[in-house]
């Protein structure tokens, strides 16, 4: 078989969990490579992609977020930083539908193939609807299926794009057959992008921590996101692993046109890879600007270092 017919020695035609099916059909089905879309939101670079407007979130008498507002611009890496307990993960949970704020809006902008604009308030939608709109996220604590292989975990990330039912998929019939091949091609491209080829058939639970974090990034990419939400993607990594992860995030952003909103505690990484930084402290926004502007913000310095 040629490179177009195989991926690392295995036929591409597989089911959603990677088990080989009907390899004799692969040459006929693979007519072109699936390409990771550039700027799937179709929002022009430099225009607002996500607007957080006066978002407030409370748990009983505890205020996690208080009237937080900022804008994530298409084509940017936007960092959200702050001390522990500042409300950063709560904000990502609101944007991904896990929490519903008591007040405010989280507006996602997009355009269709004809250029017609649409806006969705993520604060009112459930997680599966948000995923279908092109918002994907990773978690601070690894949330992978440890008993499945790397390939199988990434294939599960394609579920939001699957259009055929269980029976056609089981018998590998008609359009379901073509769809399955396309999903596998997409996953293989993500594996290439993140340089995970050597681990593709390994069970995720057996992989090193840094590789597992990369797999989680890959699964989020398999959603085909316009906006990628990353919750401390470098937590627990050593310096070399952080450098690698920063490079992969920049590759996703620069080569694939995916906008990124990330939470990260390593200020060196934040200042190096971010276009814009928003700072939270006790649920309130105390700074928003370029890395240089935030670095010079006295309120930010005080929140991190304390007042004299």
Describe each model-derived feature in a short phrase.
Residues 11:
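Cationic, low-complexity basic patches in intrinsically disordered or flexible, solvent-exposed regions
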Residues 18, 23, 27-308:
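Glycine-rich phosphate-binding loops of nucleotide-dependent enzymes
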């Amino acid at each position: 078989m040629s490179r177009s017919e195989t991926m690392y020695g295995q036929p591409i035609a597989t089911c959603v969990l990677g088990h080989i099916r009907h390899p004799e059909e692969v040459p006929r089905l693979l007519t072109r490579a699936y390409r990771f879309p550039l700027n799937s939101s179709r929002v022009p670079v430099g225009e607002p992609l996500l607007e957080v407007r006066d978002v407030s979130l409370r748990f009983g008498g505890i205020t996690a977020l208080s009237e937080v507002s900022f804008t994530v611009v298409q084509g940017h890496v936007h960092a959200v930083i702050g001390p522990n307990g500042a409300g950063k993960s709560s904000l990502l949970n609101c944007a991904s539908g896990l929490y519903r704020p008591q007040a405010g809006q989280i507006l996602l902008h997009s355009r269709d193939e004809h250029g017609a604009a649409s806006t969705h308030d993520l604060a009112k939608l459930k997680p599966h609807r948000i995923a279908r709109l092109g918002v994907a996220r990773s978690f601070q604590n690894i949330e992978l299926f440890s008993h499945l292989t790397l390939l199988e975990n990434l294939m599960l990330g394609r579920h939001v794009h699957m259009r055929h039912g269980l029976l056609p998929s089981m018998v590998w019939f008609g359009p379901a057959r073509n769809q399955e091949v396309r999903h596998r091609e997409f996953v293989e491209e993500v594996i290439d992008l993140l340089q995970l080829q050597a681990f593709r058939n390994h069970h995720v639970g057996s992989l090193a921590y840094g590789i597992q974090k990369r797999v989680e990034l890959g699964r989020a990419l398999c959603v085909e996101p316009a906006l990628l939400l990353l919750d401390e993607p470098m937590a627990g990594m050593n310096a070399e692993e952080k450098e690698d992860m920063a490079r992969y995030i920049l590759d996703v952003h620069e080569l694939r046109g995916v906008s990124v909103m990330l939470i990260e505690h390593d200020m060196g990484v934040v200042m190096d890879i971010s276009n814009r930084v928003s700072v939270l402290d006790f649920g309130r926004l105390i700074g928003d600007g370029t890395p240089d502007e935030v670095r010079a913000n006295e309120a930010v310095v005080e929140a991190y270092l304390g007042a004299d």
